[in-house]
Amino acid sequence: MNDSRWTEWRILNTSSGILNVSERHSCPLGFGHYSAVDVCIFETIVIVLLTFLIIAGNLTVIFVFHCAPLLHHYTTSYFIQTMAYADLFVGVSCLVPTLSLLHYSTGIHESLTCQVFGYIISVLKSVSMACLACISVDRYLAITKPLSYNQLVTPCRLRICIILIWIYSCLIFLPSFFGWGKPGYHGDIFEWCATSWLTSAYFTGFIVCLLYAPAALVVCFTYFHIFKICRQHTKEINDRRARFPSHEAAASRDAGHSPDRRYAMVLFRITSVFYMLWLPYIIYFLLESSRVLDNPTLSFLTTWLAISNSFCNCVIYSLSNSVFRLGLRRLSETMCTSCMCVKDKEARDPKPRKRANSCSI
């Protein structure tokens, strides 16, 4: 009798929409709750680990860019920093499902929490995707129009472009609040998101046509032509070296293009990893919206695989860019020096010595 009353009470509360975010959550991988502790252990570990890595990695990128003036010589640093801030906010936003899985209440209805969280993550990842497309256009202009590049790409235009990216990303997912459908599966850790908020084939097609497809086409077009031009330049240089052994003039004339090529390769790696991690998510998004496939495990894995890209960007950049590695090393040395100075001051209490700029390269 008591069990039936409890079931009726839960059904009534579910239909009235007053369930708290911490009261109900699902285990998408299908293992259910555990008897010892009422949490989804595996899902919690994955999300907590990703949250920590994303926040720590992107904070490092932001500090290195702040302390390494040489990185600001590249106009793409505007977009890289924008991506770092967007990815940092992704990590901070991931604290919401983490707290839900650990039974910490936010005091907000589950449906509203789910919608807001899904919208914010979708907007932030849209910003990253649009920034990658703009970076590819920037490198394309730098290599194809080196003489007029400085007139075409100015700091003012870059700032305007970044503002437009944020506005566009906010607008494109706004219809999700007006019954158009679910913008993604980022909130499916909440049961209301997984069961009551459905995707729509029309809204999914709307997002693909206005965001995913244009960004992918721009990236493919620009990098195809970048590598085509680089291959032509390399062939010309090899021909000149074969004809004229003393090729100092040709080498010096080509030196101006080498940094652009190397930097284009770094950015191409970032873009490639981004789409490799996001492609399974986009494919599942299309299949599930068309009611061809419905699998909570695939939804969870593809979604958080895509979100893990927020950490991969900083790893690729730190491994591929020598200037960034130098900035990271200088930042580490500065932090170690500061720690040593504090210890020496506590031991000897000397007069503080003012430094011009402790973190500049």
UniProtKB/Swiss-Prot annotation:
Keyword Transmembrane helix attributed: yes
Function, in words: G- protein coupled receptor activated by antipsychotics reserpine leading to an increase in intracellular cAMP and its internalization. May play a role in locomotor activity through modulation of dopamine, NMDA and ADORA2A-induced locomotor activity. These behavioral changes are accompanied by modulation of the dopamine receptor signaling pathway in striatum. Modulates HTT level via cAMP-dependent but PKA independent mechanisms throught activation of RAB39B that translocates HTT to the endoplasmic reticulum, thus avoiding proteasome degradation.
Transmembrane spans: 45-65, 88-108, 116-136, 160-180, 201-221, 266-286, 297-317
GO annotation, cellular component aspect: plasma membrane
InterPro entries tied to this protein: GPCR_opsins, GPCR_Rhodpsn, GPCR_Rhodpsn_7TM
Name this protein carries in UniProt: G-protein coupled receptor 52
Family the UniProt entry places it in: Belongs to the G-protein coupled receptor 1 family.
Cell compartment(s), UniProt: Cell membrane
Glycosylation sites: N2, N13, N20
UniProtKB keywords: Cell membrane, Disulfide bond, G-protein coupled receptor, Glycoprotein, Membrane, Receptor, Transducer, Transmembrane, Transmembrane helix
Mode of membrane association: Multi-pass membrane protein
A Pfam family per the record: 7tm_1
Xref: PROSITE patterns: G_PROTEIN_RECEP_F1_1, G_PROTEIN_RECEP_F1_2
